[in-house]
Amino acid sequence: MFKADLGRIGIQLHTTYSRRIRKVKVMDNRKEPPFFNEDNVGPFYFKLPFYDTMELFIETLTGTCFELRVSPFEAVISVKGKIQRLEGIPICQQHLIWNNMELEDDYCLNDYNISEGCTLKLVLAMRGGPISTRKVPVEDPLRELAEYMDSSRDEVWEKTSCNKQVTFLVYREGDQLNFFRVVDRGDGTLTPLSESLSGSVYNLYTDEDEEAEPSPSGQQIIENSITMNKMKLLKAKMENMNLSKKPKKVVKVKPRPPLAPRPTSSSTAAARHRLLRVLPHIGQSCLPSGNAHLPETSRNAGPSPAAQAPADRPVSSLRNELLKDDDNWEINMLSHSTSSIRLLPQLTHIELESDKELADSVLHLGSSLSRRTKHLSGNLLSNNEDDVVLFPRSEECVADELLLPEVGAFAPFAEGTGAEQSSGVEGLGKVTPEFPLTKGDGGLRAAEQPLSHVARVLSSEPGDNAVLNHREPSSHKNRLLSPLLCAAPVSLHNSLVKPQRQSKCFESGNPSASTSQNTLRELDIRTIADSSFSRTARFRGVKVDSPGKRSDIISKVEARDITEMANKASKEPVGCVNNNGFLASLARSASRDSLQSTHGACRLRSSGIGLSTNFQHFQDENIRKSSPQSEPTDFFLSARGIGMSGSNAAAGKRIGESIHHLPPVKAPLQTKKKIMKHCFLCGKKTGLATSFECRCGNNFCASHRYAEAHGCTYDYKSAGRRYLEEANPVVNAPKLPKI
């Protein structure tokens, strides 16, 4: 009966026997009363004396702690039985640990020197397998160590059978970690602590660090390169798709010109150059106000033209200082995009102060171009002086002769007395810095080239009804000009083709440089005249060079005005052109442009200018293809704006009988923009699925498509009545005779 009870509470027989032997030894020492073994079962019972008890604390891995009152001489198996009765945990799944040592069932608490108030660790070995030790809230190094120890479980499983329960214990003492394995033998007993594995946290990854990471094989390198190339191609394709759908919008800074003349120079110049620092894609350096922009200008210019004619200054010195800043900034912009610019020493009749006054007048006109785009136009010189014209383009070419000089752009701008109305010059200086002109990958050092944008205004009588009445070229007074110029028709002088009158045309630029694309913009109306025509020259072309402006952005009203202007230009003389509002609208359209096209900053489309070889072929083809009267109003639309030009001759040739020819229509560079539908009421964009046509003929969005939502003007009642009448015609049956 006693053995059955022992088996019921989970105490094995051999454990009971060993415990009996130990108790007998204690009895021999006479420290305890006699102990009767289980063999002497009889009616005699001995009452054990009462011993003092003590309280122990049992703590689980989950942090739960409870009290347990036990005797110091109580066996560990008895303590586990009490835990089973208290918590319901089977004895075979309990493991009590004290001082990093598991308590064996056969020994009592006194053998381990467990006293009052001690805390025992209770570890459970469940039938489903060991509890993961990572549930204990430990630091990251300990968690990584537990993962490392989990990987070594395979070796432990090989040593044990599959039907045994194994528990892994990890304890930390400072930086030292101890790893224990407890195996359930299957017969209710557990193995003692075995195969202890300990080590420091700091030398956990020493072996891993020593092992070099294996280098990828050649096949993997090839596959990686192929994948990388595919990703690059895909990225480029996606960028092209995005560019084709939505062109990048560049911030456009539209300056507001002042309404009154500027009284001082220091504050306004500083404000203007603060604006110039903000503008994108100009120079790399910020330009301070004052005369310190180009020190080489003052050193290399020699005697100043202003010093040669001090009595002819029309404006004050303060205004001149301000205009010097503008002039220096213009020349600096040109030097960034092309090459070094040098003013020829023969230009003796030019006044820098007057020229800078012209630059200031550009900023006074409301329809003027933006401050970022400056035109360098020169005054009319004497007949024996050489002319050098600068044409920034996509390619570099040097032509030999200039038959008809380019007429710079200026607009009618009445300020001062009529006696001051004369041809002007803007932004002339002598600059000789050298800077690299990069093309492709190699940097080319551009040599000093005598470059200047000289616009020549040929003489006309003051009585002409032109837009501007010009005085003689020898006048020193310069007119305040705006960026639009209409030149009076004049006859070509024979001295233009003399050797000493040969003009050099230097076209330079870099397609890859952004500064060359943002240098100049021109809005000009130029005339093409032959030597045989003195007063009967016609407008042969209207050219609006607005780089970066897409052709489809131009409003319909402006396009219609340009067409009408082109038709009138081929028929009327220059004196009849009085459409100043149209010219101002052209200037406004040009001032809105802030981008330069990739083809260069400005183009010269004058008739008698020798250009590069490919452009000469283009001129010859235009002359061959065009007929005398079939195309009087041909003009072309391009990404650079709306342009019309007369027929161009090859270099060194005069324009004779082909003055009435116009080039064929040039195809637009960009495809027509897809017209987006908008709601007639709210103006919201509507797509394919959100566009609704009403019976009133307008397009509406989803919320305004109903008749009551947009106040439809369609007469639904009369339409419905008419539909009912057509669907249900009135039938009059013959009357039946009465019987």
From Swiss-Prot:
Zn(2+) 1 binds at C679, C682, C701, H704. GO terms for molecular function: zinc ion binding. Zn(2+) 2 binds at C694, C696, H710, C712. A zinc finger (AN1-type) spans 673-720. It holds the Pfam family ubiquitin. Residues 246-270, 287-316 are annotated as: Disordered. This is AN1-type zinc finger protein 4. It comes from Mus musculus (Mouse).
